[in-house]
Amino acid sequence: MSFRSLLALSGLVCSGLASVISKRATLDSWLSNEATVARTAILNNIGADGAWVSGADSGIVVASPSTDNPDYFYTWTRDSGIVLKTLVDLFRNGDTDLLSTIEHYISSQAIIQGVSNPSGDLSSGGLGEPKFNVDETAYAGSWGRPQRDGPALRATAMIGFGQWLLDNGYTSAATEIVWPLVRNDLSYVAQYWNQTGYDLWEEVNGSSFFTIAVQHRALVEGSAFATAVGSSCSWCDSQAPQILCYLQSFWTGSYILANFDSSRSGKDTNTLLGSIHTFDPEAGCDDSTFQPCSPRALANHKEVVDSFRSIYTLNDGLSDSEAVAVGRYPEDSYYNGNPWFLCTLAAAEQLYDALYQWDKQGSLEITDVSLDFFKALYSGAATGTYSSSSSTYSSIVSAVKTFADGFVSIVETHAASNGSLSEQFDKSDGDELSARDLTWSYAALLTANNRRNSVVPPSWGETSASSVPGTCAATSASGTYSSVTVTSWPSIVATGGTTTTATTTGSGGVTSTSKTTTTASKTSTTTSSTSCTTPTAVAVTFDLTATTTYGENIYLVGSISQLGDWETSDGIALSADKYTSSNPPWYVTVTLPAGESFEYKFIRVESDDSVEWESDPNREYTVPQACGESTATVTDTWR
């Protein structure tokens, strides 16, 4: 007799169970639709074919279609890098229609890198210029410049695609197109990381946690990418440890200081964003890199989130265990200071990351540093290490997931009825404010949703780059800058039978000009490889035939976190919208890690919250892990 049957025999009744599951099922349904809205909206904001950004050049990511109050009709290097990293991850998980968008973006950045601007030119600081006109010309107006996070984020996005090219046989494109562009950005990071600049909110001129964190990541994965293309990055290797060393100075003992050289408290979603953009699915809960599940990052999460509890009317009356609307920082006065969609989603995403990391390592640790975070969600929390097989672990994980979902539910509540997401929503009435259809808001929705479904990006190498040097040194290093012109991409087969070719002009491949050498012409070889993407996640549809009575609902539970770790309150609701008396199907589609093996069962939840389990034995399934296979269907009958 299985553990599930023992629970059934005990007549398990969970107080409020139906309500908890109903809320989660409603959020599941909204997110499924909103993810489609977000993907479409992002493409609408990318030139030249984006429906909302007429006049933008090919591959240019426009921050928002808004042209007045405020005017965001520009392309920011930071926002573009974050958005493209999101699209690259979707592409690597099987969304192959994004190929041409990614290629066009990289081609556009070859132009942008070479545009002389108020911050300098290619080799004299120009890569730190924060924004450009959508026709790929310099913005000459007054602005907070330089901003040094952009090159790091752009490098990370391009490395992700470059690695896919290498994995799928397109070595020439990775070596001759992507690597020279990445090398420019890595050279900038190594040369300028120890100099001040404006933060991601474009307001504080100093040293910023977010900037330093993403710079460390970029140099670490940049060095590995250099090796993979048969080159090297000595400036990456010498500076990454020193950047990590400096990163430690942002820890105050109770939270992460967002910026040096600022009179504000330093509690800022800058730090939550830094944690999620340096999340590594292979990492442990390392304090040194402020991984999402680390004691430091969790303590900081509580401090930052709590700083917004009393300043927004929307958050009135909510307890410490409930999610709240989150803005940039409590002292914010822009548009009178309001919650932001991307900030509220960042609060959720960090927790989804942490849940993934705990599940992967099979335990969670509570330390003196993180105790207050856990006690707010689970009153019985105490310092110690809790195995995933323990009831305490299950209770804490369930509480954290509910807390994380609460932030996303706030976004659902204040999103427009058609799913559109602006930059902000009003702190009193929740109405959308500021720039409409903010591209970064949509990217934040997609990444939070993926992490919620345990769909994670590839490792960036944190496990070999988390050791802090004994002594910090205020250093820098010079790299190699070269102008790059992308004139064509190879014909790339991104799925088993579909060839997608980017439309370009000219001939040849890449023209690269080094600072210290004469112009050299290289030819990018057109490839007709039949390689395809093996997704890291698969959309699995569970089809169940089950005759039910009015008021009964069917849920799916199982042995993995995506199916609730056997917790009935975390079960996945099945839909009965196709149900007839002669044909009673229930179904749900769940995104699961490719290759994952697990056990599962279906349960009935009655209107009085009582639970009925299927008969033994537990069902078993292994998610497909094959070239081009991104969907699967499991057909069952209630027993």
From Swiss-Prot:
Looking at the record, the residues that make up the CBM20 domain are: 532-639
Active-site residues, record numbering mapped to chain: D199, E202
Q: Which UniProt keywords apply?
A: Carbohydrate metabolism, Cleavage on pair of basic residues, Disulfide bond, Glycoprotein, Glycosidase, Hydrolase, Polysaccharide degradation, Signal
Please indicate which superkingdom the organism of origin belongs to.
Eukaryota
Residues glycosylated per entry: 194, 205, 418, 464, 466-467, 475-476, 482-483, 485, 487-488, 491, 495, 498-501, 503, 505, 507, 511-514, 516-517, 519, 521, 523-525, 527-531, 533-534
Q: Which InterPro entries match?
A: 6-hairpin_glycosidase_sf, 6hp_glycosidase-like_sf, Carb-bd-like_fold, CBM20, CBM20_glucoamylase, GH15-like, Glucoamylase, Glucoamylase_active_site
Per UniProt, substrate binds at W143
The record ties this protein, via SMART domains, to: CBM_2
What is one GO biological process annotated to this record? polysaccharide catabolic process
Which residues does the record annotate as propeptide?
A: 19-24
Asked if Signal is a keyword of the record, the answer is yes
Any one GO molecular-function label of the UniProt entry: glucan 1,4-alpha-glucosidase activity
Q: Which Pfam families match?
A: CBM_20, Glyco_hydro_15
Supply the Gene3D superfamilies for this chain. 1.50.10.10, Immunoglobulins (2.60.40.10)
Main EC class of this protein? Answer: hydrolase
Question: Which segments carry the region annotation Disordered?
Answer: 497-529, 614-639
Q: Which cysteines are joined by disulfide bonds?
A: C233-C236, C245-C472, C285-C293
Spans of biased composition, class Polar residues? 628-639
Which terms in the GO cellular component ontology are assigned? fungal-type vacuole
Substrates-to-products reaction catalysed: Hydrolysis of terminal (1->4)-linked alpha-D-glucose residues successively from non-reducing ends of the chains with release of beta-D-glucose
Task: Identify the stretch annotated as signal peptide in this record.
Answer: 1-18
Task: Please state the Enzyme Commission number of this protein.
Answer: 3.2.1.3
Family designation: Belongs to the glycosyl hydrolase 15 family.
Protein name (database record): Glucoamylase
What high-level taxonomic lineage is stated for the organism?
Eukaryota, Fungi, Dikarya, Ascomycota, Pezizomycotina
Encoded by which gene?
glaA
